[in-house]
From Swiss-Prot:
<keyword id="KW-0028">Amino-acid biosynthesis</keyword>
<dbReference type="GO" id="GO:0008652">
    <property type="term" value="P:amino acid biosynthetic process"/>
</dbReference>
<feature type="binding site">
    <location>
        <position position="82"/>
    </location>
    <ligand>
        <name>substrate</name>
    </ligand>
</feature>
<comment type="subunit">
    <text>Homododecamer.</text>
</comment>
<dbReference type="InterPro" id="IPR018509">
    <property type="entry name" value="DHquinase_II_CS"/>
</dbReference>
<feature type="active site" description="Proton acceptor">
    <location>
        <position position="24"/>
    </location>
</feature>
<dbReference type="GO" id="GO:0019631">
    <property type="term" value="P:quinate catabolic process"/>
</dbReference>
<feature type="binding site">
    <location>
        <position position="76"/>
    </location>
    <ligand>
        <name>substrate</name>
    </ligand>
</feature>
<dbReference type="GO" id="GO:0009423">
    <property type="term" value="P:chorismate biosynthetic process"/>
</dbReference>
<feature type="active site" description="Proton donor">
    <location>
        <position position="102"/>
    </location>
</feature>
<keyword id="KW-0456">Lyase</keyword>
<dbReference type="GO" id="GO:0003855">
    <property type="term" value="F:3-dehydroquinate dehydratase activity"/>
</dbReference>
<dbReference type="InterPro" id="IPR036441">
    <property type="entry name" value="DHquinase_II_sf"/>
</dbReference>
<keyword id="KW-0057">Aromatic amino acid biosynthesis</keyword>
<comment type="pathway">
    <text>Metabolic intermediate biosynthesis; chorismate biosynthesis; chorismate from D-erythrose 4-phosphate and phosphoenolpyruvate: step 3/7.</text>
</comment>
<protein>
    <recommendedName>
        <fullName>3-dehydroquinate dehydratase</fullName>
        <ecNumber>4.2.1.10</ecNumber>
    </recommendedName>
</protein>
<feature type="binding site">
    <location>
        <begin position="103"/>
        <end position="104"/>
    </location>
    <ligand>
        <name>substrate</name>
    </ligand>
</feature>
Length: 151
């Protein structure tokens, strides 16, 4: 049975494809989840993909990832990136390798988006690659944990 990673998406990411497409593109959350599932499988991993607009639910899933012995977490915390000490603490607490992802380049946007509480709890951060950032995050996570894409 393949090792599992969690791909967690935070608030408003359910609106991908329709919310500000000039910034976030036209890909939907279903497209993101399909890309993540396929990329994980190519690395011999299984992806559990979830989205919530609620901070506590995201924290519960981070804890569940530990309980289910997941080997990695990819997190797009959305707006919680800039405000949530609790998400930071959850990631630090579970001690699972994590990658922070953002569809847009947060550093080319409003100054309040330039700070991330998630970054210090993750071993890597990716932003500005569109949904391809998720693929890159999974490939980086696979390399970190010692699996790799199959040719």
């Amino acid at each position: 049975m393949p090792q599992t990673i969690y791909v967690l998406n935070g608030p408003n990411l359910n609106l991908l494809g329709t919310r500000e497409p000039a910034i976030y593109g036209h890909a939907t959350l279903a497209d993101v989840e399909r890309l993540c599932t396929e990329t994980a499988a190519s690395c011999g991993l299984s992806a559990v993909c979830r989205q919530s607009n609620h901070e506590g639910e995201l924290i519960d899933w981070i804890h569940q990832a530990r309980d289910e012995q997941a080997v990695g977490i990819v997190l797009n915390a959305g707006g919680y990136t800039h405000t949530s000490v609790a998400l930071h603490d959850a990631l630090v607490g579970v001690q699972i390798p994590a990658v922070e992802v953002h569809v847009s380049n947060v550093f080319a946007r409003d100054s309040f988006r330039h700070h991330s509480f998630i970054a210090k709890a993750a071993f890597a951060s990716l932003c500005g690659f569109g949904i391809d950032g998720y693929r890159l995050a999974i490939l980086g996570l696979a390399a970190k944990i010692g699996t790799s894409a199959k040719a």
